[in-house]
A protein has these predicted regions:
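Conserved N-terminal entry element of GNAT/NAT acetyltransferase domains
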Residues: 1-15, 163, 170
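Glycine-rich phosphate/pyrophosphate-binding loop shared by adenosine-nucleotide-utilizing enzymes
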Residues: 2-4, 66-72, 160
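Hydrophobic adenine-recognition pocket in adenosine-nucleotide-binding enzymes
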Residues: 9, 92-94, 127
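Helix-loop element at the rim of GNAT/NAT acetyltransferase active sites that forms part
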Residues: 19-37
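Acetyl-CoA-dependent GNAT
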Residues: 25, 38-97, 108-109, 168-170
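Conserved active-site alpha-helix within GNAT-family acetyltransferase domains
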Residues: 101, 105, 130-147
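Conserved GNAT acetyl-CoA-binding A-motif
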Residues: 108, 115-126
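Conserved catalytic-core motifs of GNAT/GCN5-like acyltransferases
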Residues: 124-127, 139, 144-160
Length: 170
């Protein structure tokens, strides 16, 4: 088994993250809300976005195997409004060949620790209703379904629902 390192993202990871996102959005049965063309953004703006998130105290992690970014993970707080600064939005993607190897569990543990350390009161996420594996992972970490967005996305000639899930720390 290849060694998988989970670490904080850096600006230098921008190109690898973009490649990872393009790869996963190209999978025929993946549950992401963008196309490969939409994921293919210039490196410099992505690099700047990584820097900005880290400077704001957000959690931005990558998992790496043999020098390749194989997962991206974020917990982002919108600092625009004081009344919602206790809420962080979680996002995660893992390359197909590395799924079911505990990477998601390791990333979720890091998110819970980060949320407690930063005194985050609420972690929330959105997941496709058909993404049973991801939903199971989130439930394992105490996330609960709060609602459903019907016909949230239209991909591959059909509509998909999404679920809003959260975990409260307060």
């Amino acid at each position: 088994m290849k060694e998988i390192v989970i670490r904080a993202a850096t600006r230098e990871d921008a190109e690898g993250i973009i490649t990872h996102i393009i790869d996963i959005s190209s999978e025929p049965d993946i549950y992401v809300s963008y196309t490969p063309e939409e994921a293919n953004i210039p490196v410099e703006p992505k690099s700047d976005r990584i820097k900005q998130h880290l400077e704001m105290g957000n959690l931005y992690l990558v998992a790496e195997a043999e020098g390749k970014i194989i997962a991206e993970f974020t917990c982002l707080v919108d600092h625009s409004y004081a009344i919602t600064r206790h809420t962080a939005v979680l996002g995660m993607s893992v390359d197909r060949e590395y799924r079911n190897q505990g990477i998601g569990t390791r990333l979720m543990k890091a998110a819970i620790d980060w949320a407690r350390d930063k005194r985050i009161g609420r972690l929330e996420l959105e997941v496709y209703a058909e993404n049973v594996a991801a939903i199971h992972l989130y439930e394992k970490f105490g996330f609960e379904v709060e609602g459903r967005k019907r016909n949230y996305a239209y991909q591959r000639d059909r509509y998909y629902d999404s679920l809003i899930m959260s975990r409260l720390f307060i």
